């Protein structure tokens, strides 16, 4: 009798699945799965300890593994309602006695345990519509209300179905991760080669892409009532950006670590006695058999767990609740070691290739000399990328308390991330204010000092020089969001309301200030902020904040998926386009418009080894030396006019060693020397007479041409450009307005004070600047006539230096 009761009970469940399958879909094998049965009323007299049902429409087989308990002792009737995306599509009233299910006519109290297979009639199988097999992550469920013969409400159960088709795909996860990684790798490589404009653009766009991916995951971590399956599945594609990646052996290590450090690891993924619905987080009191899960919808017990928020994401990724924090922290540390190891190995390879003569000595010179500073800057940039991940997981660990050791690690990561970002922000503001005090432009030191640029450039190169401080606003915005997600998991409605307000304020601020380095980058980040605000608005419906019908939330779930999938595709294609332009372009800087903040005017060119001369300068000096040698050979004809020839001969004697050591390619060949001998004019006296006449009109050459600075070379014999007018600076900083005054004034290098020597001294305690003489690009000539006298920078600890 007990067996027949269980058998008929399973048949009832099979009927419910078939009714719901009218709006469901199957994968290629056309499989329908139901793994969770939850109660939808308090004190329900029918509940499930474990529930696993699989229906195969090809052979009409229904495999079920049930462990249920009931307290009903009467004749019962079932009111079955099937919902698709919140719309009721099927309603059926079933008298269990009329369908000859004797074990339900009447039902007696007890446990129901069965594992069996039943074949369903083709009448029900043929009712499944064809469109049901084409939609991924379909949102369908069945609600069964059980009453007795006097219409007394006895029990309510709700069953959620899955079809095996989903938009959460391994290929999508790898594609998004690889493209974002390519963007960061290219920006790092271009920075090493000195292509600053291209590197700044690709770095800014890739960082914005990372922050957008993380924002999608953050909004999906909110403790809302129920996330539509299509929206939850898309968020799973981007969970890798938060370090939540499942590796089986690592999960075993984390479980052992939590247990060995005083915690109790969870085993929900391997448990065979529990049913899990990945929608809501699990809380229940051990002394109560049934606990309310929401205001008016679902309930669970000690054997039926309902996850949502961070736990839901972890469960969907195959990570135990007590291993979520350990997983995120571990992948962050491992990726950091890989980054540092890559830079160190690359440096060793470059040094080895240089010593073996495989590459020229001038190649990667800046990287070889400042690789330690580049390594520090790369690690700071990496911590900046992982700031969202570290703060959210650390704050959430304080509420979960997996084990004392994990709590200590969370404290250390909070101090690490927040401390380093505060230090980078403070140093950036310090250097910018000192630059404004000295040169009336924050870009002078932020981009002119290689020490500052390599170490703290990640903090401000994405933004216009006048908005160097914007990352402080961005990090504060991220920090507040982390507080909401980490500490407010107990109240999803509180989270979504404050999250929407916060996103809205940031959206208005970024439109008002437009802080990024150029217009296209500003437009892209404004669009990202727009999508983020819309996502926050949609999750307000998922939290039942407005008490609307679930059909509204289901439609919003599809809007969330379509909008974010399309926008992610556009961003990924843009990064790939940038990568293609850089890989197939000889000069990637020409592909991008320079930022309108004069940063290129202050950035130094790629450093050269000591004792070498730029190729163009060496060619000019070689040509000047050849002319001087020709005149020296004709000195017998010009004995009365030695002024100019002495100057040129001295220039040749001083130039020849430097030219030879700087570039062997510039040395004249033997055939060129022979041709130069036979190419002299026949009337040599006439040529020397002409030279004698023109000599007084020429400028007096300095005695040491090789020691000429770039400024002296550029002004030697310079003439004003006819008809040339300078336009106003787009940055409105007043640096270009005094171009005419520069032509008549003395050539003063604003970055070098002969009375003070080096501008900055890293060995001193006055701010940690690097000792160097700044060289400014004279082709831009945008600084203007600095009327203010240079003064010694205040000390690092001097009063009032900020």
Swiss-Prot record:
A GO cellular-component term linked to this record: endoplasmic reticulum
Side of membrane Lumenal, spans: 29-169, 222-229, 279-323, 399-405, 489-495, 547-557
Any one Gene Ontology molecular-function term assigned to this protein's record: FAD transmembrane transporter activity
Subcellular location: Endoplasmic reticulum membrane
Phosphoserine modified-residue sites: 616, 635, 779, 782
Spans through the membrane: 170-190, 201-221, 230-250, 256-278, 324-344, 378-398, 406-426, 468-488, 496-516, 526-546, 558-578
InterPro entries xrefs: TRP_C, TRP_Flc/Pkd2-like, TRP_N
Regions of compositional bias (Polar residues) in chain numbering: 653-663, 697-717, 761-788
Segments in the Cytoplasmic topological domain: 191-200, 251-255, 345-377, 427-467, 517-525, 579-802
Annotated signal peptide: 1-28
Glycosylation sites: 149, 321, 547
GO biological process: FAD transport; fungal-type cell wall biogenesis; sphingolipid biosynthetic process; transmembrane transport
Span list, region Disordered: 629-802
Annotated membrane topology: Multi-pass membrane protein
Family of the protein in this entry: Belongs to the transient receptor potential (TRP) ion channel family.
Protein name stated in the entry: Putative flavin carrier protein 3
Gene name of the encoded protein: FLC3
